[in-house]
Amino acid sequence: ISRKEASDYIEQYFKTYPKIKGYIDSMVEDAKKTGYSLTMFNRRRPIPELKSSNFMQRSFGERVAMNAPIQGTAADIIKLAMIRVYDALKKGGYKSKLLLQIHDELLVETYPDEIEDVKKIIEDGMKNAVKLSVPLEIDMKQGNNWLEAH
């Protein structure tokens, strides 16, 4: 789409959801005051670019201030889920292994006789990694390799 269409789309989105615009603006203002953004778990992301005299660097800093609290919180949550899944697999004496984390995805090598148990462990670990006011929804797929699982 053109820049104009994208701009119109964003403008309409914020008109429809004005509280989101307010939230984003407050995240940027808070980061400008403190020099960092915070995740829901109070993990700091320094943003020195917000103090730059260079417009492009400052704009980058503002985008970081908008995205870091949300993306950083998601990263914190997936790490907590990984710990829960790893601990449950270890405690249960499973041969299956947590291999890889890609953004909000966990890749688990699972033995055929453990598939159903491991699915339950993953579901519990991811859905209950943290208590929020909204449920954490997950998708789970399986295959003989990563490609098949997608």
What is the predicted role of each segment?
Residues I1-E5, L106-I121:
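Catalytic palm subdomain of template-directed nucleic-acid polymerases
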Residues I1-Y94, L100-Q101, Y111, K141-H150:
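Conserved catalytic core of nucleic-acid polymerases
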Residues T16-P18, D124-L132:
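A common structural junction motif
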Residues Y23-I24, E123-G125:
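Glycine-rich, charged/polar anion/phosphate-binding loops
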Residues L99-H103, P135:
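Short Gly/Ser/Thr- and Asp/Glu-enriched loop/turn motifs at secondary-structure junctions
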Residues V130-K141:
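Conserved short beta-strand edge segments in small beta-sheet-based binding/regulatory domains
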